[in-house]
């Protein structure tokens, strides 16, 4: 606690790690053909996607560096700074997107690549703005982030990587399970895919609520642990789990009750609307399980536990979610009830996989908190 200068060194080393990882990411994004081939899209669509990803790759270093600064602001209880930066970026990106996509003022219409260029510009603008705030802000001077130049320290980089890699892979597993779900549903036809995309988009928006609460919880748990208050850390974690779950149960009920007005916001054709509405029951349950698992995962990160959760995600989301969804959606065994075939089968399996992940992660949290409290009794003064 209060080892402020060490925070600056951690940030500098994290920037080195983000640079190395962004180079790997750029290499993958610049050669996406093997991944896109899974979708079996038309050559025209694939060509546009390849160009889009190759442009987006140039924004990755800025995005990765920005993630380090986001983590710093969250850790020192200054998330509002990042929030305002992101809101400002959003207001800039909307007209920039429109300009580059549709053209004007001497710029030809670029379409989807224009959107990618706008994203790259905003990513770099965010990074520069956040870096400037840390450099000039009086609050941040105590951390000495820019006090000196640090060469890569292999020991510190490895320490960061050991914790960060499982967290990153957990994100990868979660994102790819959802992405491949869409790719598989695409094989069912444009109608099921359109319905799925509407529900998935709504689910992504709703996910921001438990995600933001989970990030705040992780910060408070980490701060309590750093202050040698393990009992407080456990109490904060439990309170957050209860509050987040109750909130998402309420959200799930609202989504189910107001499914038709919510669908009307997307103004879909009637056939797409019918396809999407059949998935709303799943998203109502999905929100609750998603809230439980993400909150538990972030609490465990506060305890510096990330390796076991990564495997829980892999087995649950890839094995149960994708594997189970494939079996149900495509009626692999030949005796799957029609009511849970197609896109509904994928959503059912995905919801079940999140429920399993949530149960396992909560169990791990209870054991971890109990063990940590036993090994680190509260400091008495």
Predicted regions and their residues:
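Short membrane-interface helical motifs at transmembrane helix boundaries
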Residues: 24-54, 250-273, 277, 330-333
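Hydrophobic transmembrane helix module of multi-pass membrane transport proteins
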Residues: 18-108, 113-121, 128, 132, ...
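Hydrophobic/aromatic residues within transmembrane alpha-helices of membrane transport systems
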Residues: 1, 7, 35, 49, ...
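Interhelical loop/hinge segments that connect adjacent transmembrane helices in multipass membrane
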Residues: 112, 116-119, 131-174, 370-381
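Transmembrane helix-bundle signature of multi-pass secondary active exporters and lipid flippases
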Residues: 56-63, 158-223, 227, 244-252, ...
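Small-residue-rich hydrophobic transmembrane alpha-helices
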Residues: 1-26, 30, 63-82, 195-259, ...
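Residue-level recognition of pore/gate-forming positions within transmembrane alpha-helices
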Residues: 13, 22, 26, 89-91, ...
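Membrane-interface helix-loop junctions in multi-pass transport and translocation proteins
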Residues: 80, 91-128, 274, 307, ...
């Amino acid at each position: 606690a209060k080892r402020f200068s060490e925070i600056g060194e951690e940030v500098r080393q994290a920037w080195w790690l983000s640079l190395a990882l962004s180079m790997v990411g750029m290499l993958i994004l610049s050669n996406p053909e093997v991944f896109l081939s899974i979708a079996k899209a038309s050559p025209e669509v694939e060509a546009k996607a390849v160009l889009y990803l190759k442009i987006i790759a140039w924004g990755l270093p800025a995005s990765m560096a920005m993630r380090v600064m986001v983590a710093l602001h969250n850790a020192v209880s200054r998330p509002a700074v990042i929030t305002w930066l992101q809101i400002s970026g959003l207001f800039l990106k909307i007209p920039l997107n429109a300009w580059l996509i549709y053209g004007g003022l001497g710029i030809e219409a670029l379409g989807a690549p224009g959107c990618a260029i706008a994203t790259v510009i905003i990513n770099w603008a965010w990074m520069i703005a956040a870096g400037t705030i840390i450099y000039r802000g009086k609050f941040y001077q105590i951390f000495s982030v820019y006090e000196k130049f640090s060469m890569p320290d292999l020991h510190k980089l490895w320490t960061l990587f050991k914790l960060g890699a499982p967290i990153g892979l957990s994100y990868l597993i979660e994102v790819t399970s959802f992405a491949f779900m869409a790719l598989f549903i695409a094989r069912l036809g444009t109608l099921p895919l359109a319905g799925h995309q509407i529900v998935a988009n709504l689910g992504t928006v709703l996910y921001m609520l438990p995600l933001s609460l989970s990030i705040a919880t992780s910060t408070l748990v980490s701060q309590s642990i750093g202050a040698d208050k393990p009992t407080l850390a456990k109490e904060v974690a439990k309170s957050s789990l209860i509050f987040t779950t109750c909130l998402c149960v309420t959200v799930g009920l609202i989504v189910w009750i107001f499914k038709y007005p919510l669908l009307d916001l997307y103004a879909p054709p009637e056939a797409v609307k019918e396809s999407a509405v059949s998935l709303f029951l799943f998203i109502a349950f999905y929100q609750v399980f998603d809230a439980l698992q993400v909150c538990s995962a972030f609490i465990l990160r506060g305890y510096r536990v990330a390796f076991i959760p990564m495997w829980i995600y892999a087995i649950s989301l890839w094995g149960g979610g994708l594997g189970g969804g494939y079996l149900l959606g495509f009626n692999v065994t030949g005796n799957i009830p029609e009511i849970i075939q197609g896109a509904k089968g994928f959503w059912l399996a995905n919801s079940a996989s999140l429920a399993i992940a949530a149960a396992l992660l909560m169990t791990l949290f209870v054991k971890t908190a109990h063990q940590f409290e036993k090994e680190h009794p509260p400091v008495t003064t």
